[in-house]
Amino acid sequence: MPVTQFSHPDPYSYQTGFDSYHETEAVKGALPVGQNSPQKAPYGLYAEKLSGTAFTAPRHENKQTWVYRILPAAAHENFKAEDADSYHTSMTTETHKLHHIPNQLRWDPFDLDETVDWVHGLHLVAGAGDPTLKHGLGIILYAAGKDMGKEAFYSADGDFLIVPQHGVLDIQTELGRLMVRPNEICVIPRGVRYRVTLPAGPVRGYICELYQGHYQLPELGPIGSNCLANARDFQAPVASFEDEEEPTEWRLYSKFNNTLFSARQDHTPFDIVAWHGNYYPYKYDLGRFNTIGSISFDHPDPSIFTVLTGPSDHAGTAIADFVIFPPRWLVAENTFRPPWYHRNTMSEFMGLICGNYDAKTGGGFQPAGASLHNVMSAHGPDADAFEGASNAELKPQKVGDGSMAFMFESCLMVGVSEWGLKTCQKVQEQYNEHSWRPLKRHFKNPNKA
C-alpha cells in the first residue's frame, strides 16, 4: 500500500484535498451562515480575514480565509527587534552576506542542537531574491531540541515548505494541529501563526521558504488527470482552539525581512474557533507519490518527480520546485539509468531524508547532509556510480528502497550564507576530488591507428 508506515502515531483529524475550499468549526454554530462578517458573530467571536493574495487576484489564484476568533490578531504590544546574535536567518547584513560562487558544494550531516527551540534553531543556508519585493526563496536548515513555550511564530516573508529529516514536529497552528514526521512534508503559508513542540525528542530538517506566490501542484500535461502528488492526499487541519478566561503572557515572534522581532500579548494566539477558506497549512505523505518513469529507454528529465512548484512569472519556470527521488523501478533498455551528467540554468539544492541516493554510490552524500549545484555548475553521477551503471546487467531493478532524496530547484542563482559556507563547518572541501576527479577517460578515437 502506497502509504508510509510511521512509527509515531498521528492523533489528529484532517480535511483532505489540495487547494480545496474548506470549512471547519470546533464549536457547532460558530460559523456564520450565508455571510462572512455579521454585525455580531456567533458566540461573541470576532470575524477576521486572512489574505494570502491581493483581493483582485484571479479567482483561480485567490487565497483567503475567514476566521472567527476570541480576540483579533492585532491585540498585542509593539514588536521589537531581537538581538541579532539570537537568530540565524539574516541574509543581507555585512556579517551575514551571501556568497555567490560557482563551486559545487556538499555538506556533511548537519548537527542536532538540543539547546534551542524552533524559532532559534532556524539557520539560513542559501537563498536568492528579496522578501521585501516578494521575489525569491530562502533555504533553511532547522535543528532544535526544546519545545516552544507560551510562544507563537510566523513568517511575513513567505511560505515555509518543511521537510523533516529527524524527529517529529507537533505543530499547533491558528487553524488547527498537524503532526509532521520524516517522509512527510508540510507547508505553512505566509502569516499563519504556529507553535512547535517535539514529542519524540530533537528534530532536524530542511525548509524552502518561497517569497513569491504560493506552492502549487505541477501541471500534468499528457500524463493526464492523475499521478505524481494527487490532490486528494493532502491533509489540512480542523479547527482547534484554547479558551483562556484569565490573562496569560504570550510572546509572538515575527520573521520580517529575515529579521526576528517579538511582541507580547496577554492571551493565547490559538483562539480561532472556526474558519472557512482556501488559505491554510497542510501536510503530505511522500509515500503516496505516484512515480512516473521511462518504460522504454533513456532517463526522463527529473521534472517528472516534482511534488510542488512555486512558479515564476515565466510559464514553466519555477522560483522553487520541490522534487523527490522515491523508491522506483528502473527498466529502461540499453540506457545509462542514473541521472545523466548535467549543466543546468537552474540551481539545484539536494538533501537526503534517509537511505542512499542512487546517483551517489561512492559515499559522502548522507542523510541530514546536502549539496548545492548552482547555475551552470557541472554535476552528475560520481565515478563509482558511473562505473557501476555503465557495466550493470540491465534487468528490471528496484532502487531507492528505504531511501528518500529530494531537491529544491530554482531558476535563480543561489547565494550561500556565511553560516552555510563557513560557520557550520560542514562543507566537504574534497567534494570534486572525491566525486568527479577520479572519472577515467574511455574515449577511443576511431580515426587514430
Swiss-Prot record:
**Entry-linked NCBIfam families:** hmgA
Would you identify the family this protein belongs to, as annotated?
Answer: Belongs to the homogentisate dioxygenase family.
**Enzyme type, top EC level:** oxidoreductase
Q: What does the UniProt function comment say about this protein?
A: Homogentisate 1,2-dioxygenase; part of the L-tyrosine degradation gene cluster that mediates the biosynthesis of the brownish pigment pyomelanin as an alternative melanin. The 4-hydroxyphenylpyruvate dioxygenase hppD catalyzes the conversion of 4-hydroxyphenylpyruvate to homogentisic acid (HGA). The protein hmgX is crucial for this conversion and thus, probably functions as an accessory factor to mediate specific activity of hppD. The homogentisate 1,2-dioxygenase hmgA is then involved in the cleavage of the aromatic ring of HGA and its conversion to 4-maleylacetoacetate.
This one is known as: Homogentisate 1,2-dioxygenase hmgA
* GO MF assignments: homogentisate 1,2-dioxygenase activity; metal ion binding
Organism per entry: Aspergillus fumigatus (strain ATCC MYA-4609 / CBS 101355 / FGSC A1100 / Af293) (Neosartorya fumigata)
Give the gene that encodes this protein.
hmgA
| Keywords for this protein | Dioxygenase, Iron, Metal-binding, Oxidoreductase, Phenylalanine catabolism, Tyrosine catabolism
Is Iron one of the keywords?
Answer: yes
Q: Which cofactor does it need?
A: Fe cation
Q: What is its EC number?
A: 1.13.11.5
DNA repair keyword on record: no
User: InterPro entries attached here?
Assistant: HgmA_C (IPR046451), HgmA_N (IPR046452), Homogentis_dOase (IPR005708), RmlC-like_jellyroll (IPR014710), RmlC_Cupin_sf (IPR011051)
Q: Which reaction(s) does the protein catalyse, per the Swiss-Prot or TrEMBL entry?
A: homogentisate + O2 = 4-maleylacetoacetate + H(+)
> Any phenotype upon disruption?
Impairs growth on L-tyrosine as the sole carbon. Leads to the accumulation of homogentisic acid (HGA) and its subsequent polymerization to pyomelanin.
Q: How is its activity regulated?
A: Growth under standard conditions leads to moderate phosphorylation of mpkA and hppD and hmgA activities are balanced leading further to degradation of HGA and formation of 4-maleylacetoacetate. Cell wall stress, resulting in disturbance of balanced hppD and hmgA enzyme activity, (with reduced hmgA activity), leads to HGA accumulation that polymerizes to pyomelanin.
The conditions that induce or repress this protein are given as:
Expression is induced by L-tyrosine. Expression is positively regulated by the cluster-specific transcription factor hmgR.
One biological process GO term for this chain? Answer: tyrosine catabolic process
